[in-house]
Amino acid sequence: MKNIILSTLVITTSVLVVNVAQADTNAFSVGYAQSKVQDFKNIRGVNVKYRYEDDSPVSFISSLSYLYGDRQASGSVEPEGIHYHDKFEVKYGSLMVGPAYRLSDNFSLYALAGVGTVKATFKEHSTQDGDSFSNKISSRKTGFAWGAGVQMNPLENIVVDVGYEGSNISSTKINGFNVGVGYRF
């Protein structure tokens, strides 16, 4: 699976480099992303989008997201003298590409499809009667990711991006949104 992700990244980067050299119009935006992971709280992070346009109303858009969240619990069980600290971390990343369609000079719609990966780690540390115990369990899964959104150009060189992103990785549903601002050149 790492080879698939690496291959997708190399191909996307190659396309972007070639398109930048021949581009009529490029747009780059960076923004805030937030998603809800099934049976967990919200995770937050960053989303980056690149768009290439020529004279056609149909263009190419790519999206890269990285999000992180954690949950911690500490406490003690007094009769047994146990003190514990647990930490659960979730990291999510996605790489997607797709078409964008310009409806007017200031408004476009886009759809994305690609790959998403989630890594969950559980760390446990406890002490009992002066003895210390630690445990760590980690799992990484990869699956299909999709998205859709709108890009607006309130000014000729400014891009405002609002999008939805979802994935279903190994029966874990991840749904969220992203909002970004960027530059069109």
UniProtKB/Swiss-Prot annotation:
Signal peptide (UniProt feature, chain positions): 1-23
Keywords from the UniProt entry: Cell outer membrane, Membrane, Signal, Transmembrane, Transmembrane beta strand, Virulence
Cell compartments where the protein resides: Cell outer membrane
Keyword Isomerase assigned: no
Membrane topology of the entry: Multi-pass membrane protein
Keyword Heme: no
GO cellular component: cell outer membrane; host outer membrane
Function, in words: Essential for full virulence and survival within macrophages.
The name this protein goes by in its record: Virulence membrane protein PagC
Species in which this protein is naturally found: Salmonella typhimurium (strain LT2 / SGSC1412 / ATCC 700720)
UniProt gene name: pagC
